[in-house]
Amino acid sequence: MDLILEGSQLALQIHESVGHAIELDRILGWEAAYAGTSHLDLTKLNQHKYGSELMNIVADATLPGALATFKYDDEGTPAQRVDIVKEGIWTGVLSGRDSAAVAGVKPGGMVRADGFGRLPMVRMTNVGLLPGTSSLDEIIQSTEDGVYMETNRSWSIDDLRLNFQFGCEVGWLVKNGKIIDMVKNPTYTGITPQFWGNMDMLAGEEEWVFWGTPNCGKGQPSQVGHTGHPASPARFKETRVGVRG
């Protein structure tokens, strides 16, 4: 069944299945608290297929008005925009000075602490999915058999950021291009690269919204950080969904 996600749910999908997985300290195995490590392998950088050609992810700490925008990170590195996924291919990571030196990449200016007495660590900035050219109406109208889901209710993902299940507050059955009924407690499951590889429609700039979270936890002792996740609605083909009428 085809799955259509509205922007706020897609923002959490980005956070959990992309954002934490591309933190370089997790990729290197230095950090595992709360979110585990990562399925990504640095030897596959610029080769690994993360998703379909519609998938363009950037980490941009310079984005005006977004939740994780700043001038300099807590190591004094200027804020910047880094390409993370380009046309479906994994091209970048979230890094600081130490992790970048080990990996042989340019420091990304992505190290922050939630207070002066805390150790700075790699954190997501504004990790967003660049908009496409469709609209939500067009996506629904072109869907023969699917579910449109809105507003997160629950999430679960393994410690490699691969296998996941998400639940939403409300879902709408879509048949032959029309919404025909509401469904309760809709859920969907997937495996990260296959899920993103099935993205075949993506709404444009008019529906691109600066979503995010003010309370992303990481580290031991725990620290809380702001993360931004700009996104617009998208469709994912052949997704395993569960609904209750």
Regions found by a protein language model. Give the residues of each.
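N-terminal small-residue-enriched
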Residues: 1-245
